[in-house]
């Protein structure tokens, strides 16, 4: 089914929902959400967190701090750590682990330089990687996996394997919502949204892990650089890590976080890994479970 056929099948309210994404003040709403999430209003904050957790069915039994009163702000709640051993890391040395809790949005083979966003929608490696053709070349005919983090999910992101950070790229962009419905109806979504591209060397070849921003994702951070945004510079910014500034991370180690959920995209080189056969589109997943095996 092509895009025009899909549009013809949409209800009136679905069309309004899509149109609103194009006209709403994305940055203003995101800044407002960021301001709100920082506020410490005592009992009011605790009450609103409780309402949020009830609406989205957040499982607080897995959190290191299971009581709503333990969180002074929404930010603290959004990036709440898990209890010890809540997410065991698969220790098979030939296995790569899922970086986050959520659902598989898409996964599979990169067809030359095209990745599947949703049925009927493709986007290019070159666009996703902000025009870095040399970097994109590494992943032609490789494998990819896209994990969507909903508001209910654990919001920290971890490493699929041992790795050495080579480069980080901040790419300014739009702030469309990245929920599955919008992924089906906003072309080139992940390549047009704000994102942080992290490039690693691993025993499985080069690997990219991308944190994709979205509406009301107030900030993205990494453990080596802290909060990346805000501020939100209007140009692409690149950091390189080598020599004394090299950053080494271990399998399962936290590497970053979203202040409210979004999407993580992993890229792997050709003939280096085989994605786990049990993973399907819309599969619920947990950080630490198997994502792929070494070929």
UniProtKB/Swiss-Prot annotation:
It catalyses: a 1,2-diacyl-sn-glycero-3-phospho-L-serine + H(+) = a 1,2-diacyl-sn-glycero-3-phosphoethanolamine + CO2. The record marks 261-262 as: Cleavage (non-hydrolytic). It holds the Pfam family PS_Dcarbxylase. This is Phosphatidylserine decarboxylase proenzyme. One of its GO terms (molecular function) is phosphatidylserine decarboxylase activity. Is synthesized initially as an inactive proenzyme. Formation of the active enzyme involves a self-maturation process in which the active site pyruvoyl group is generated from an internal serine residue via an autocatalytic post-translational modification. Two non-identical subunits are generated from the proenzyme in this reaction, and the pyruvate is formed at the N-terminus of the alpha chain, which is derived from the carboxyl end of the proenzyme. The keyword Metal-binding does not apply. It is found in: Cell membrane. One of its GO terms (cellular component) is plasma membrane. It is an enzyme of class 4 (lyase).
């Amino acid at each position: 089914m092509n895009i025009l056929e899909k549009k013809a099948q949409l209800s009136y309210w679905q069309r309004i929902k899509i149109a609103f994404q194009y006209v709403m003040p994305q940055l203003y709403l995101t800044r407002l959400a960021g301001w709100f999430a920082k506020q410490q209003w005592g009992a009011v904050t605790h009450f609103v967190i409780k309402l949020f957790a009830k609406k989205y069915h957040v499982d607080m039994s897995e959190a290191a701090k299971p009581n709503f009163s333990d969180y002074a702000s929404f930010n603290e709640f959004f990036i709440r750590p898990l209890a010890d051993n809540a997410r065991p890391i698969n220790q098979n040395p030939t296995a790569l682990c899922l970086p986050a809790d959520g659902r598989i949005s898409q996964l599979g083979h990169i067809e030359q330089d095209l990745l599947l966003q949703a049925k009927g929608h493709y986007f290019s490696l070159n666009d996703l990687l902000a025009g870095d053709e040399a970097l994109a070349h590494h992943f032609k005919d490789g494998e990819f996996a896209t994990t969507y983090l909903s508001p209910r999910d654990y919001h920290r992101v971890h490493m699929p394997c041992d790795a050495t950070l080579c480069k980080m790229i901040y790419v300014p962009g739009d702030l469309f919502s990245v929920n599955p419905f919008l992924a089906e109806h906003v072309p080139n979504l992940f390549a047009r949204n704000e994102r942080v591209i992290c490039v690693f060397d691993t025993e499985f070849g080069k690997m990219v892990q991308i944190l994709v921003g979205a509406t009301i994702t107030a900030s993205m951070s990494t453990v080596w650089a802290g909060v990346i945004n805000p501020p939100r510079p209007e140009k692409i910014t690149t950091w390189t890590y080598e020599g004394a500034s090299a950053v080494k991370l271990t399998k399962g180690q936290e590497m970053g976080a979203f202040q409210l959920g979004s999407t993580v995209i992993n890229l792997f080189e050709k003939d280096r890994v085989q994605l786990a056969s049990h993973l399907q589109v819309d599969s619920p997943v947990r950080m630490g479970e198997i994502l792929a095996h070494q070929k």
